[in-house]
Structure formats: structure tokens, C-alpha cells
Amino acid sequence: GASSVGKVVKYTVFLPVILLVIMAIKGCTMSGAGEGLRMFFIPSTSAFEDPSLWIDAIGQVFYSLSIMMAIMFAYGSYLGESANVAKDCVIIALSDAAVIILSVIVMFSTMGGVGMLDSITDSGIATAFIVYPQAIVNLTDIGWFNALFGAIFYLMLVTLAIDSAFSIIEGVSASVADKFHFNPKKVTRWACVISAVISLLYATRAGVAWLDIVDNWTNQINLIVIGILECIAVGWCFQIDKVWQQINRNTKKFKMPRIWIRLAIRYIAPATLL
């Protein structure tokens, strides 16, 4: 339930941010960090002509904000009557963008500091478990410091994984428990067991290949298709004015214009995803 999740995520959400700040400070103080940061903040304009770049970016935003995922419906059901949806959405989006920028600063500054910017374009899996560990080894000549920095990095990954697991499992368990009136704890337990068994596939020799396939499917094709279908369902099949009323129900100064809601959900969002 919401109370159990809240007790854990308040640590798993803020701890990675603290660790990222520590890593960013270290990365930005390295001699070659400027080259990496320059590569990030002044990108090649030709890269924006690649359609796959935009698909990857949309998939990243969808996954990072959990847009179109079951967890949004589950967490939404936990909101009280006084919740300011419009304000919360703005805060969440800006916070997410800030953390993403901080993460990229850590990556580019560290990779620039150890002279490994040529490997920055590797896949996310390779970057996290092959390229970045190599960069950590070359941080300094002090072995224990490199080991400490590596421990901080992987502690951050573990806390992020736990936080993601909570969101994924809660979205499934809350929906099933509410729909069929099952015991929420039992549903959560079975969801964890089934997910753990399925995840054993990634521990096989073909695990990396399967992980790439699932990652590309869920973060790109699947989320985009579901996004278009949900825009059609909400914009054309559901009374969109009710959505507008719910968004602005508890707002005082910042109110979402009705015309913008209609245009965004019915036309702009589907066209952008296509």
C-alpha cells in the first residue's frame, strides 16, 4: 500500500541524488572534466537529424516519468481530495529533468577526466557495467579511493533498482488486488516471485541479448504505442472536460487552460509520438 511504499522510497529516492552530487563534485574537479562537459552542453547539431535519437529520448522520458505505466494509475488512486495535480506534475517533471542532467554531468565529467569520451556512446548496459567501472579504476592512483567511489556508484544503482521495483510491482499488485478483491500482501508476494523467476532469464548466457530486446521494446515501441492509444482513449472516448476539471480542481494560481488540454491530448501528443 501507499504507507509501506512511502516508508521505503523516501530513502531510495533521495539517497541516489545525494550520491550523484558526491560523484558530480568529484567528476567536475578532474583535469579533463571540461572536455566532457563541453561535449555534453555543446553537442553536434547533426546528431539531432537522427530519428533514432528522438525515439530514444521519448522512451527515456516515458520510462523516467513512468508515463503510460500502471504505477501512475496506482499512485493516482492514493492521492487525497486536496491533491494539487497540476502543481505536482510540474514539480515531478522539473525534478526528473534536474536529476537526469545531474546524472549526465557525472557521466561526461568522469569519462572526460579519465580520457574515455570515445566510449560514451556505448549502450546503457555496457556503460554501467563495463565502461564506467573502467573509468572508476583510472580515477586516481589511490586504490582505496577508487574502490570507495565504485561502491558509491553501485550503491546508487541498487537503490534506483529497488525504487523501480517498488513502482513496477505496486502498479501490478494494486490493480489486481482492487479488481479481484484479493489480499494486497499476497498479490504483491506472488508478483515478486513471478518477476524474480522471469528475471532468471537475464542470468543466462543469452541474458544480455534478452535484456537489450526487452529494454528496446519496453522503452521505445511499447511505450509509444500505448501512449498513442491512451491519448485516443482519453481525448476522444472519455469526457476530456472531466480530465481538465480534475487537473485544476485544487489549483489556485496555476490553472491549465482547457483548450491546451484538448489540443495536447487529442492532437499534439499523438502527432509527436507518430
Residues covered by each model-derived region:
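C-terminal membrane-solvent junction of multi-pass transporters and transport-like membrane proteins
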Residues: S173, F180-C192, W217-L273
